[in-house]
């Protein structure tokens, strides 16, 4: 099963009641390796949680979620994290998981990265919420997965246009990463 969206246009209500068009980046969801892995790549848009849930319902033997994402909408990431957490799935990052993607990654039972993977953190921002509201959601999500208040405070000092990518030693020390796999330890992204 492959779900690919190249461009999604949605009408998103804003707090003022006005509506604006919002263009969301492309994403793909694929079930791999005889149904044992689900790969998500691209932007965490509003449509992702529903499609993610459908893909998992059709592939009940999935044990690991492979993430490769620059981020996206924080609420979409929280919904994906809820699904991952409820199914007790592991998460794996072969390359990059940044911004809102880190919330989905933290939901993994085992949180595995390749030796060359990068996890990126910064303040939340996005349409429909103030910066303060977005950062409260981010803080609550990170607290849910037991990140220290010192780590969260550091993330909240990184402006939304910047990205902090702690090294693997730091990520292991604070409990974000539970395992580091050598590059190529997991099969390549092929069905």
Annotated model-derived regions:
Residues 1-12:
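Bacterial N-terminal signal peptides
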Residues 40, 65, 105, 171:
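Terminal peptide-recognition signature
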Residues 49-56, 77-81, 85, 102, ...:
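Extracytoplasmic/secreted envelope proteins and their assembly/folding machinery
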Residues 123-191:
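Charged, glycine-interspersed solvent-exposed loop segments at helix/strand-loop junctions
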């Amino acid at each position: 099963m492959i779900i690919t969206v190249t461009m999604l246009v949605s009408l998103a209500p804003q707090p003022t009641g006005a509506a604006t068009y919002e263009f969301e980046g492309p994403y793909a969801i694929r079930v791999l390796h005889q149904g044992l892995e689900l790969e998500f790549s691209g932007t965490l848009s509003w449509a992702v949680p529903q499609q993610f849930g459908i893909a998992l319902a059709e592939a009940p033997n999935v044990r690991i979620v492979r993430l490769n994402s620059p981020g996206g909408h924080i609420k979409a990431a929280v919904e994906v994290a809820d699904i991952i957490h409820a199914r007790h799935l592991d998460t794996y990052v072969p390359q990059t998981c940044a911004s809102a993607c880190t919330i989905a990654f933290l939901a993994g039972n085992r949180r595995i990265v390749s030796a060359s993977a990068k996890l990126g953190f910064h303040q939340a921002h996005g349409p429909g919420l103030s910066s303060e509201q977005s950062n409260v959601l981010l803080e609550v999500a990170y607290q849910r997965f037991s990140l220290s208040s010192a780590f969260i405070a550091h993330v909240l000092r990184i402006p939304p246009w910047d990205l902090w990518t702690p090294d693997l030693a730091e990520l292991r020390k604070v409990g974000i990463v539970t395992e580091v796999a050598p590059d190529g330890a997991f099969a390549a992204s092929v069905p």
